[in-house]
């Protein structure tokens, strides 16, 4: 029997509230800055941003939520947005079959996009080929997602807000995990990225890697196995779509900029949070890797459906690259990061970037050679131009 004492509802709520404020911990920020990293509750994951600007022609905010609390995300500075171009041949394969309840198998990203109509989870007479010639390289970034957890499990959701997606979608979002691959359009505000379990939406949940190993009857120490690496990550692809141009949504972006940088800095810790951590500090397990699985059902899966039940006509915007965000997940019950935690996170992010070419910023650099973008023939946007299937082909971690 487990020796862990499971927290009460109030303690869980306090833990969520407190860990969410890790993003404003100056000590943590200073440690991360030594590795060229930052922590915030909003990550800018854009396919096309203008030079030296927070706006662009296809920009997205990614947030991590437990209940209604935004959780910390660790990555490079939002404004600078250091990225790398990963050859499509080096990308992990996508697990498919979850969309229609068939046997799981793997396909490449190129195969998935060229025959998207086979994997979108909707019956359509249209053939969709969303793969472009420029997609021999994919614009890639990596981030550590921090979840509040002492013991047991925690459910969470990834939110994506695309500023150009109003009445019609400007991006198709593909969420790839060891359990399967799910595709949905983003339209009309914050969109939770669910798992498509044979047309049923499901959230994700996480447990500590030590607890996962214990449930498997294995030693709780040692390096991550292929299975554990596959169950630690989520791969989020944003595929730019052609959409009807509307008035640029710059105001919202500036609000997002303020929210990300200014409001977090003024965050304060609640009395409940302080009391909880004073009470449980001696029982703290610190930070560890998370093992992901599928959470509760959230109703029918929307996918590429309109609100009236029709299906969106999708056309690839070939002037912009695909954006891949590689997420790996950590669990913690403290608002601090040890030096070892910071080094582990930095090393994992580094391993992702080392698999690509032309590392750098497309926002502040005056010259770029990233093949993920078209040649700068004009003043251009900075970036334009279930059961898991376990295999070392589906993970970059």
Swiss-Prot record:
Residue ranges with Polar residues bias: 375-388
Region (Disordered): 368-391
Domain of life: Viruses
Protein name: Uncharacterized protein R588
Gene source species: Acanthamoeba polyphaga mimivirus (APMV)
High-level lineage: Viruses, Varidnaviria, Bamfordvirae, Nucleocytoviricota, Megaviricetes
């Amino acid at each position: 029997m487990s020796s862990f004492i499971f927290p009460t509802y109030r303690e869980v709520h306090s833990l969520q509230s407190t860990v969410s404020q890790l993003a404003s911990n100056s000590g943590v920020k200073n440690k991360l800055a030594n590795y060229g990293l930052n922590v915030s509750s909003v990550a800018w994951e854009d396919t096309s941003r203008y030079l030296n600007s927070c706006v662009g022609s296809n920009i997205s905010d990614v947030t991590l939520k437990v209940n209604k609390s935004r959780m910390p995300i660790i990555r490079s500075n939002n404004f600078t947005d250091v990225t790398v171009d990963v050859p499509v041949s080096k990308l992990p394969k996508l697990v498919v079959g979850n969309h229609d309840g068939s046997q799981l198998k793997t396909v490449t990203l190129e195969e998935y996009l060229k025959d998207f109509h086979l994997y979108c989870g909707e019956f359509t007479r249209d053939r969709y080929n969303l793969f472009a010639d420029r997609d021999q390289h994919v614009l890639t970034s990596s981030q550590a997602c921090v979840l509040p957890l002492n013991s047991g499990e925690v459910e969470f959701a990834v939110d994506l807000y695309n500023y150009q997606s109003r009445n019609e979608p400007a991006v198709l979002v593909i969420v790839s995990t060891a359990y399967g691959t799910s595709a949905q359009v983003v339209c009309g505000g914050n969109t939770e990225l669910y798992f498509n379990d044979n047309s049923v939406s499901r959230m994700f949940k996480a447990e500590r890697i030590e607890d996962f190993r214990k449930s498997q009857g294995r030693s709780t120490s040692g390096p991550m196995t292929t299975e554990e690496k596959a169950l630690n990550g989520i791969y989020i692809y944003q595929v730019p779509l052609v959409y009807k141009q509307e008035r640029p949504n710059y105001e919202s972006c500036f609000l997002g900029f303020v929210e990300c940088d200014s409001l977090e800095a003024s965050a304060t810790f609640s009395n409940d949070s302080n009391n909880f951590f004073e009470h449980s500090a001696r029982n703290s397990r610190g930070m560890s890797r998370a093992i992901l699985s599928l959470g509760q059902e959230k109703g029918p899966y929307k996918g590429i459906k309109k609100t009236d039940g029709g299906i969106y006509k999708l056309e690839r915007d070939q002037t912009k690259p695909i954006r891949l965000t590689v997420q790996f997940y950590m669990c913690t019950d403290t608002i601090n990061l040890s030096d070892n935690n910071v080094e582990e996170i930095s090393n994992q992010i580094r391993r992702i970037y080392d698999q690509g070419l032309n590392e750098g910023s497309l926002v502040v650099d005056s010259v770029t050679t990233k093949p993920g973008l078209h040649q700068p023939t004009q003043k251009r946007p900075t970036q334009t131009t279930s059961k898991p299937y376990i295999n070392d082909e589906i993970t970059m971690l």
